[in-house]
Regions:
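Outer-membrane beta-barrel "beta-signal"
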Residues: 51, 150-152, 176-182
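A short, acidic, flexible beta-alpha connecting loop/helix-capping segment that sits on the rim
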Residues: 163-166
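C-terminal closing repeat unit and adjoining cap/tail of repeat-based domains
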Residues: 144-161
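A short, acidic/glycine-rich surface segment
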Residues: 128, 168-170
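Solvent-exposed loop/turn segments connecting transmembrane beta-strands
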Residues: 138, 170-174
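Hydrophobic, lipid-facing positions within transmembrane beta-strands of outer-membrane proteins
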Residues: 2-6, 43-47, 99-103, 142-146, ...
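Short, conserved loop/turn and helix-capping segments at secondary-structure boundaries
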Residues: 39-40, 174-178
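Detector for outer-membrane/organellar transmembrane beta-barrel domains
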Residues: 11-138
Length: 182
């Protein structure tokens, strides 16, 4: 069965919008305990916005929350956590609650040059003692990014970026990294 989505967007000028969206999905799995196929529903809600505070300042952000939508969240998309084992029910799976959001601010120095900064968080929540046997599994990630972009032409953009990221596992073991991109 495909994922079903719906969205509605309100624009109040060329650079400003508010968008609401939803997704419902079904995930099927086979149980080795009863040799039957079972399914779990996943669902999520999203809200996003972008608007000008002044002609040079723009605010933007997005929030996503749901169960079984890890493939749609940046840090969670490669972890295969849309549907996971339920340690309390042998042979059964479950969907976990997850949250992702970011908020940022952009300043347009000129028509072709801008700087921006963004903070983001992705989080996977535990249910039914999962992941009881994987304490080093990803629980939460955060990043803070600052960048500078120059639109050289309509088809060429160059930029530089600094990113600081933090990761916390279910064992509460924190890690961090710094990165420069150009």
């Amino acid at each position: 069965m495909p994922d079903f989505t719906a969205s509605a967007q309100y624009n109040w000028n060329a650079n400003s919008h508010l968008k609401l969206a939803a997704i419902v999905r079904s995930m099927t799995y086979s149980s080795s305990v009863d040799n039957k196929a079972h399914s779990k529903a996943g669902y999520g809600l999203q809200a996003s916005t972008s608007f000008n505070v002044t002609p040079k300042w723009q605010v933007y952000g997005q929030v996503n929350h749901g169960k079984g939508i890890g493939q749609y969240l940046n840090d969670l998309s490669n972890l295969n956590v849309d549907i996971v084992p339920n340690p309390e029910k042998e042979g059964r799976m479950q969907t976990l609650p997850m949250l992702g959001w970011f908020a940022g601010l952009q300043y347009n120095i000129s028509k072709n040059v801008f700087v921006s900064g963004t903070y983001s968080l992705s989080r996977l929540y535990s249910e039914h003692t999962y992941p009881s046997d994987e304490p080093d599994m990803y629980r939460k990630g955060q990043y803070l990014v600052a960048n500078l972009f120059w639109n050289v032409t309509s088809n060429l953009q160059v930029g530089a970026e600094y990113l600081r990221g933090w990761r916390t596992d279910f064992s509460s073991n924190p890690r961090h990294a710094n990165r420069m991109n150009a």
